[in-house]
Swiss-Prot record:
It comes from Clostridium perfringens (strain 13 / Type A). PANTHER family: ACYLPHOSPHATASE. It holds the Pfam family Acylphosphatase. Residues 3-89 form the Acylphosphatase-like domain. This is Acylphosphatase. The keyword Nucleus does not apply. Disulfide bonds: none annotated. The gene is acyP. It comes from the Bacteria.
Length: 89
């Protein structure tokens, strides 16, 4: 199990992007959260097996049809074993 942080830039606020992330995470049995930042970016922390996180990243890069992702900055994080679901803030 691994945990990643994705800082997503582009048209990602006000277009259902966080809820799209939550849906994709649930399909892949991932936990974590997606949160709007004041600068217009979305911060995502996601946790699960490496191949599912790779699939998740591909899905969010392609977006939901309303969003437009310009870039995703990625960072490795420490696994949170207490986390049980994917949330949006």
């Amino acid at each position: 199990m691994i945990r990643k942080e994705f800082l997503v830039s582009g048209r990602v606020q006000g277009v259902g992007f966080r809820f799209f992330c939550k849906y994709q995470a649930s399909l892949l049995s991932l936990t974590g959260y997606a949160e709007n930042l004041d600068d217009g970016q979305v911060l995502i922390e996601v946790q699960g097996d490496e191949s599912s996180i790779r699939k998740f990243k591909t899905k969010i890069l392609n977006g939901n049809g309303f969003s437009r992702v310009i870039s995703i900055d990625e960072k490795d994080l420490t696994v949170d074993t207490r986390e049980k679901r994917f949330s949006t803030y």
